[in-house]
Amino acid sequence: MKILLANPRGFCAGVDRAISIVERALELYQPPIYVRHEVVHNRFVVEGLKQRGAIFVEELHEVPDDNIVIFSAHGVSQAVRQEAKERALTVFDATCPLVTKVHMEVARASRKHMEVVLIGHAGHPEVEGTMGQYASLQGGMYLVEKPEDVLGLKAIVKDPSNLHYVSQTTLSVDETADVIDELRRVFPEIQGPRKDDICYATQNRQDAVRELAKDVDVVVVVGSKNSSNSTRLKELAEKLGTPAYLTDCPQDIEPQWFDGKVKVGVTAGASAPEELVNQILTRIKELGAQSVEEVLGREENMFFEVPKELQIKQID
């Protein structure tokens, strides 16, 4: 049995930045450091940060006064920002800059009193944060998940000629394309972002899985079940006809996943660390894999700076 390892895989620039923000805050300010929501959706990463003194909460009322709070990579609503300001909490914002771009699109549309449609999954923290950027009382903001949801908007959209759409950054490109096509069919005048909202890392990892799935008998996606982009990778492989499994724990891997399989594809969601990928590879080798081959893929050079207050100066 042979393992083919997808490229690119694992951490993206936004996740790297978010984790660095928590690590540097712990180093510079000492524990406890509070983090609103899991900084990234990966159990392995979150447990490691907890052990170093990070305390993860779901809402700001769980953060004691006079403390530091970090907003997760998924972003927060304006109401959460205002609450932090009113309580004079020290805030470090780990929102991915690509999510912030979508937030700015929504805020801009809101100022123009345009109605906005967000393509995304209800309950996902990125969606909650993005919906929370809209403030216009004259317009409205609506969430759709699939093409079938679009027709229902006809009864509630006030002005189809003044309508804009944005997308959750971690959806599959295919998923959003179908919804966008339906939006344009039902609302021919709808406007969209100048550049697709799906982030570069999501796109690149999905492209890599498309190629990988053609050449293997089964795909293992390293990532947590609450990670949207990791789940999309699994679904994409399955859509292409290749059995796929999502795991963030080597002990969860079942020997029968590989019964009769010759080639095993392995990739990782944008919030999965390479350390965890290596643990998964070790487990698959224990189950009979004899070699690992890296598959060539698109090179990524994206880098996002941490806030200047957390930039640790080198001492000569």
Swiss-Prot record:
Isopentenyl diphosphate binds at H41, H74, H124, S227, S228, N229, S271. Its EC number is 1.17.7.4. Gene3D superfamilies: 3.40.50.11270, 4-hydroxy-3-methylbut-2-enyl diphosphate reductase, catalytic domain. Binds 1 [4Fe-4S] cluster per subunit. Pfam families: LYTB. [4Fe-4S] cluster binds at C12, C96, C199. Dimethylallyl diphosphate binds at H41, H74, H124, S227, S228, N229, S271. (2E)-4-hydroxy-3-methylbut-2-enyl diphosphate binds at H41, H74, H124, T169, S227, S228, N229, S271. Keywords: 4Fe-4S, Iron, Iron-sulfur, Isoprene biosynthesis, Metal-binding, Oxidoreductase. One of its GO terms (molecular function) is 4 iron, 4 sulfur cluster binding. Signal peptide: none annotated. It catalyses: isopentenyl diphosphate + 2 oxidized [2Fe-2S]-[ferredoxin] + H2O = (2E)-4-hydroxy-3-methylbut-2-enyl diphosphate + 2 reduced [2Fe-2S]-[ferredoxin] + 2 H(+); dimethylallyl diphosphate + 2 oxidized [2Fe-2S]-[ferredoxin] + H2O = (2E)-4-hydroxy-3-methylbut-2-enyl diphosphate + 2 reduced [2Fe-2S]-[ferredoxin] + 2 H(+). The active site is at E126 (proton donor). One of its GO terms (biological process) is terpenoid biosynthetic process. Its cofactor is [4Fe-4S] cluster. Coiled coil: none annotated. Pathway: Isoprenoid biosynthesis; dimethylallyl diphosphate biosynthesis; dimethylallyl diphosphate from (2E)-4-hydroxy-3-methylbutenyl diphosphate: step 1/1; Isoprenoid biosynthesis; isopentenyl diphosphate biosynthesis via DXP pathway; isopentenyl diphosphate from 1-deoxy-D-xylulose 5-phosphate: step 6/6. Belongs to the IspH family. Catalyzes the conversion of 1-hydroxy-2-methyl-2-(E)-butenyl 4-diphosphate (HMBPP) into a mixture of isopentenyl diphosphate (IPP) and dimethylallyl diphosphate (DMAPP). Acts in the terminal step of the DOXP/MEP pathway for isoprenoid precursor biosynthesis. This is 4-hydroxy-3-methylbut-2-enyl diphosphate reductase. It comes from Vibrio vulnificus (strain YJ016). The gene is ispH.
